[in-house]
């Protein structure tokens, strides 16, 4: 009976310690509020972002959200997804109600959201991605992600500050690290891809790619009334000057994706430490987005890329 009692106490303590991932923040932006919603199902990752009557996120499985992830080479040839800590959870979590990722902390008040998450590996130890075996030996990684999301930063209502810190643990060896600071999976109605030249202040049509470039990307509806883009004062990464902003169209899955990616490469090994990045996610009409990028660019100080 004593053993049973201890078991019940342990279970109760575990349940008491569980952190809810259900939250919502909001703030006025033009004719509407920007509303951001997280869920426990996704371990605090962003499930929904709405503005002016439209959903901007095509949330499905545990990969298609507004979220963060990382990829590493484990000291061998770099193969995407084979060592891939992911905020929202694992591929095996699918469309189910739970996440392999563990949410350690969440606060949401007014227009500010903060979370701390222990990321799951995208693949299970015995799984493969495009024929390539997982390099991780556990389902849950020791990689931590902290994020702070603020709607309406710097007095700009259409700008969402997206600050992330990836903690790379000790006792791992990597020569190459790829940090997807933020990615957005969007409904196919955001079918028009754009890039924005900040120097010339010029909006340019962008091909489907897929791939990355050094200029920020924006997706919009055909009527330009709804758009989402991303820009970071820290781009591009040192040594990767032609990359940083990706765009992808997945016809079969009926989803489009953009991302903001940073890279670290060191022949003797990527240091076990915190890696922090600041991005801005822009939401509104296409004009709102380009006007906001211009305003941010004018007031954001340059990032020292030798410090992290």
Region roles according to the model:
Residues 24-29, 36-37, 46-48, 111-118, ...:
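Generic recognition of long tandem-repeat/solenoid scaffolds
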Residues 181-184, 189-251:
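Active-site/ligand-binding surface loops and adjacent short beta/alpha elements
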Residues 5-14:
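Bacterial N-terminal signal peptides
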Residues 50, 156-199:
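Acidic (Asp/Glu-rich), glycine- and aromatic
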Residues 74-157, 171:
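Extended, loop-rich substrate-binding clefts of extracytoplasmic carbohydrate-active enzymes
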Residues 17-103, 278-286, 290-302:
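Beta-strand-rich N-terminal accessory domains
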Residues 18-32, 37-39, 224-308:
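Beta-strand-rich recognition/accessory modules
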């Amino acid at each position: 009976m004593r053993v049973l009692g201890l078991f019940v106490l342990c279970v109760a303590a575990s349940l008491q310690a569980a952190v809810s991932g259900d939250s919502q923040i909001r703030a006025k932006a033009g004719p509407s509020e920007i509303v951001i919603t997280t869920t426990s199902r996704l371990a605090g990752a962003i499930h929904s972002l709405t503005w002016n009557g439209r959903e901007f996120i095509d949330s499905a499985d545990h990969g298609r959200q507004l979220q963060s992830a990382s990829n590493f080479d484990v000291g061998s040839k770099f193969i995407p997804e084979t060592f891939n800590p992911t905020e929202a959870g694992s591929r095996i979590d699918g469309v189910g109600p739970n996440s392999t990722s563990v949410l350690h902390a969440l606060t949401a008040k007014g227009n500010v959201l903060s979370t701390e998450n222990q990321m799951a590996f995208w693949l299970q130890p015995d799984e493969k991605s495009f024929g390539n075996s997982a390099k991780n030996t556990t389902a849950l990684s020791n990689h931590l992600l902290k994020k702070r999301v603020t709607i309406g930063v710097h007095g700009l209502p259409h700008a969402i500050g997206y600050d992330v810190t990836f903690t790379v643990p000790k006792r791992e060896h990597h020569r190459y690290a790829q940090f997807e600071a933020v990615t957005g999976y969007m409904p196919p109605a955001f079918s028009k891809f754009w890039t924005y030249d900040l120097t010339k202040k010029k909006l340019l049509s962008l091909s489907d790619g897929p791939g990355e470039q050094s200029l920020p990307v924006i997706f919009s509806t055909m009527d330009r009334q709804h758009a989402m883009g991303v820009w970071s004062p820290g781009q591009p990464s040192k040594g990767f000057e032609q990359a940083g902003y990706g765009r992808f169209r997945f016809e079969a899955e009926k989803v489009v994706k953009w991302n903001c990616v940073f890279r670290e490469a060191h022949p003797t090994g990527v240091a076990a430490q915190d890696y922090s990045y600041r991005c801005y996610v822009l939401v509104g009409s296409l004009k709102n987005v380009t006007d906001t990028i211009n305003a941010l660019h004018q007031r954001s100080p340059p990032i020292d890329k030798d410090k992290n």
